[in-house]
């Protein structure tokens, strides 16, 4: 029996279990797990484990921090807004420089990727609404939203390090929301530095997994 796997590509396999009555029946739940693991592996390969996106986001936060010091919080917000819009294009550009394969059209995690963009816009709206009240609190609240957003990346990429990244940003946002003068720097600098650190960790883990796969 020929079965077409729904990955978006013409990948046909001979299902020997269906043809052999002595073989145990297929377990749909187990096959679903295999499919989701393949989808996650495809995302990791296409986006280097998500490291370029985290790197681009870190640059956006650092650019906003520079704008905050030079021109003020309002310019920092618009810098972060523009930088946020450029995260995906820059991440894709970096991926193409590494000649990464594209995600297949049938990948079930593609929709999750689009859904993960919505909190970004929600966070920007929340931050914009809080700007007249407190610039520090506005950026801290946005950091909280971004931290929560990263939690979904653990499912998208099959990478638990995103739980740690989300928790760190959530802690940073909470700390600066409670105590804006906690450190002699803006929350934008701390968030940007944290994202660049995790981007390096994510890229290192992805590169190590590629090396293991090549050696196997």
Describe the function of each predicted region.
Residues 39, 92-106, 148-156, 199-207:
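C-terminal ends of transmembrane helices
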Residues 120-170:
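Membrane-proximal helix-loop-helix units in multi-pass membrane proteins
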Residues 58-69, 119-129, 150-151, 169-180:
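Hydrophobic alpha-helical transmembrane segments and adjacent interfacial helices
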Residues 23-45:
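Short, Lys/Arg-rich, polar N-terminal cytosolic tail immediately upstream
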Residues 53-112, 117-118:
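Selected alpha-helical membrane-embedding segments in polytopic membrane proteins
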Residues 44-53, 106-113, 131-137, 154-163:
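Short, amphipathic, aromatic/basic-enriched membrane-interface segments that mark the entry/exit
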Residues 161-216:
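Terminal transmembrane helical module of multi-pass membrane proteins
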